[in-house]
């Protein structure tokens, strides 16, 4: 039985998140003062028009904002720890294992030089200490779960050999591979 106080503890708390992009033309405040609270087992949808900061918010939570962007303010508390204060080595154990993300553009998220099965298997090897054979078996199971026909053969395909929809299914299969506590779908 779960303690009542434990059940009420947020899994994710984003407080006053501010992510800005520093360009030659000035500062773009892509995310400016976002607050989010997600409890275990809860589903939260963020909606808005194109360019309003939904993806930047998700990438900020994952600490995947690249230059010229930067999280300039706020807190991202995951299970009580501020992700913005974690060293990158510790963040790498959180990312993909405890928090996972389904990216919007599978063609740019999948590595074109590795077979899709290798990419899913790598996630399992790095975060869950699966052996090669166990990772291959689990990869095929995950591909089947997302409705990819002939999963054994598709695991051997390179990303460019898949349709856009099939590549998106690979991303959907990869994200929950390690049974994360939080899944972000962009």
Feature names for model-found ranges:
Residues 82, 134-153:
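Conserved ABC ATPase "signature" region
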Residues 177-181:
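A short, proline-enriched helix->beta-strand linker immediately N-terminal to the Walker B motif
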Residues 71-82:
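Conserved ABC transporter NBD signature motif
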């Amino acid at each position: 039985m779960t303690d009542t106080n434990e059940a009420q503890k947020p899994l994710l708390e984003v407080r006053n998140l501010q992510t800005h992009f520093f360009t030659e033309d000035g500062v773009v405040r892509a995310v400016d003062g976002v607050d989010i609270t997600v409890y275990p087992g809860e589903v939260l949808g963020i909606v808005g028009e194109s360019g309003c900061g939904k993806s930047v918010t998700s990438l900020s939570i994952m600490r995947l904002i690249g230059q010229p962007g930067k999280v300039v303010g706020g807190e991202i508390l995951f299970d009580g720890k501020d992700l913005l204060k974690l060293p990158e080595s510790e963040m790498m154990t959180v990312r993909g294992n405890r928090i996972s993300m389904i990216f919007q553009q599978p063609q740019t998220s999948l590595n074109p030089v590795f077979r899709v099965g290798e990419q899913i298997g790598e996630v399992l090897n790095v975060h869950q200490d699966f052996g090669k054979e166990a990772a291959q078996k689990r990869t095929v199971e995950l591909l089947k779960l997302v409705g990819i026909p002939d999963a054994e053969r598709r695991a051997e395909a390179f990303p460019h050999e898949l349709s856009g929809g099939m590549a998106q299914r690979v991303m959907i299969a990869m994200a929950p591979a390690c049974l994360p506590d939080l899944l972000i779908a962009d």
